[in-house]
Swiss-Prot record:
This is Translation initiation factor IF-1. Pfam families: eIF-1a. Keywords: Cytoplasm, Initiation factor, Protein biosynthesis, RNA-binding, rRNA-binding. Residues 1-72 form the S1-like domain. Component of the 30S ribosomal translation pre-initiation complex which assembles on the 30S ribosome in the order IF-2 and IF-3, IF-1 and N-formylmethionyl-tRNA(fMet); mRNA recruitment can occur at any time during PIC assembly. GO terms for molecular function: ribosome binding; rRNA binding; translation initiation factor activity. Gene3D superfamilies: Nucleic acid-binding proteins (2.40.50.140). Its main location: cytoplasm. CDD domains: S1_IF1. It is found in: Cytoplasm. One of the essential components for the initiation of protein synthesis. Stabilizes the binding of IF-2 and IF-3 on the 30S subunit to which N-formylmethionyl-tRNA(fMet) subsequently binds. Helps modulate mRNA selection, yielding the 30S pre-initiation complex (PIC). Upon addition of the 50S ribosomal subunit IF-1, IF-2 and IF-3 are released leaving the mature 70S translation initiation complex. InterPro entries: NA-bd_OB-fold (IPR012340), RNA-binding_domain_S1_IF1 (IPR006196), S1_domain (IPR003029), TIF_IF1 (IPR004368).
């Protein structure tokens, strides 16, 4: 089975939720719930409210995503 292409979008962290979950507003205005990717968790990358992040969304559920990059 072929791997589905994920959608990458830029966004801003609005709120911090429990269990390393975040509420992120995307550039197009949609608000999604996102968690930190494994490599960011392993390297102790801190994400705070207001940070610019790159979120990876799957085509199956566009309301949830994974934070894969935090802009400086």
């Amino acid at each position: 089975m072929a791997k589905e292409e994920n959608i990458e979008m830029q966004g801003t962290v609005l709120d911090t939720l429990p269990n390393t979950m975040f509420r992120v507003e995307l550039e197009n205005g949609h608000v999604v719930t996102a968690h930190i990717s494994g490599k960011m968790r392993k390297n102790y990358i801190r994400i705070l409210t207001g940070d610019k992040v790159t979120v990876e969304l799957t085509p199956y559920d566009l309301s949830k995503g994974r934070i894969i990059f935090r802009a400086r």
